[in-house]
């Protein structure tokens, strides 16, 4: 799949990022991961991101990363394209990127570099180096320390033909509008704020109709119902799902830092697809919070 073909796929539909399965000892559980991917693939996501932020990329050893990407690519070979999360320092990100390409990933999600403070010129140089290390398509994720503006993205687009996507995790509307207007159809644009459904209608109005869904991991039918309501501008259906599910969900998620991942793993367990515990420094939901989520999921009915 060439970068432009990937760009076309990412320009439509719902995207998601499976959690990574760990066993009771905290080691990667490929059998559970295969079962998860086989469950989720038929629900109709346009692409899946393996070892992304919700897939705990930041906690994976290099050998585990290879196992996760290979398992995802092999399992979904005939069903849905797999993009691999990559990140860390420039040299680390290049090693991950080249390994993902070797294993058959169709594209990459370039996560923000970790902790190091840097100018945005330096961040742009980091992005360029990773893009030029591979031939597959790359989506850059503006979030946290990565805050590339329209000027820098325009330069990167000229230098890196395989940079085909922009994912926004900042929520800076002025910046999003300037990037969308300046870059036009050069990129595929993805909404990437945590619990992106809450912002989906607003982002669609800005020309960003595609987003990645975390809750697809455990209420895939509800996630697709919401996406379809957004797509057809069914404001009543959107409002009802936000009131009935997403706002109560946020009340639980926002109780503790890092719960954006932890709550998804809890939901997967409730749904019958236990992915094991999160790895430190993240923490799992309390028993009370787990029961609150279970009751909320029960209201959504069979998936």
Swiss-Prot record:
GO terms for molecular function: 4-hydroxy-tetrahydrodipicolinate synthase activity; 5-dehydro-4-deoxyglucarate dehydratase activity. It is an enzyme of class 4 (lyase). It comes from the Bacteria. It holds the Pfam family DHDPS. Keywords: Lyase. Its EC number is 4.2.1.41. It catalyses: 5-dehydro-4-deoxy-D-glucarate + H(+) = 2,5-dioxopentanoate + CO2 + H2O. InterPro entries: Aldolase_TIM, DapA-like, Dehydro-deoxyglucarate_dehyd. One of its GO terms (biological process) is D-glucarate catabolic process. CDD domains: KDGDH (cd00951). Pathway: Carbohydrate acid metabolism; D-glucarate degradation; 2,5-dioxopentanoate from D-glucarate: step 2/2. Belongs to the DapA family. This is Probable 5-dehydro-4-deoxyglucarate dehydratase.
């Amino acid at each position: 799949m060439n970068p432009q073909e990937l760009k076309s796929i990412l320009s439509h539909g719902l995207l998601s990022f499976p959690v990574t399965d760990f066993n009771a000892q905290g080691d990667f559980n490929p059998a559970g991961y295969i079962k998860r991917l086989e469950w989720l693939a038929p629900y109709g996501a346009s692409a899946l991101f393996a070892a992304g932020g919700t897939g705990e990329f930041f906690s994976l050893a290099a050998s585990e990363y290879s196992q996760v990407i290979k398992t995802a690519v092999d399992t979904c070979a005939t069903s849905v394209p797999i993009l691999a999360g990559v990140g860390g320092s420039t040299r680390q990100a290049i090693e991950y990127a080249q390994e993902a390409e070797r294993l058959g990933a169709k594209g990459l999600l370039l996560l923000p570099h970790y902790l190091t403070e840097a100018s945005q010129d330096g961040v742009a140089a980091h992005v360029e180096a990773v893009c030029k290390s591979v031939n597959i398509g790359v989506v850059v994720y503006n979030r946290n320390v990565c805050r590339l503006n329209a000027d820098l993205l325009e330069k990167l687009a000229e230098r890196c033909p395989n940079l085909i996507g922009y994912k926004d995790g900042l929520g800076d509307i002025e910046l999003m509008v300037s990037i969308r207007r300046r870059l036009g159809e050069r990129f595929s644009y993805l909404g990437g704020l945590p619990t992106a459904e809450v912002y989906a209608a607003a982002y669609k109005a800005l020309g960003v109709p595609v987003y990645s869904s975390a809750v697809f991991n455990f209420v895939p039918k509800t996630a697709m119902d919401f996406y379809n309501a957004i797509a057809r501008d069914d404001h009543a259906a959107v409002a009802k799902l936000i009131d009935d599910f997403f706002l109560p969900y946020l009340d639980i998620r926002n109780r503790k830092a890092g719960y954006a991942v932890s709550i998804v793993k809890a939901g997967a367990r409730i749904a019958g697809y236990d992915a094991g515990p999160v790895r430190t420094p993240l923490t799992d939901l309390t028993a009370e919070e787990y029961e609150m989520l279970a009751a909320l999921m029960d209201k959504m009915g069979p998936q």
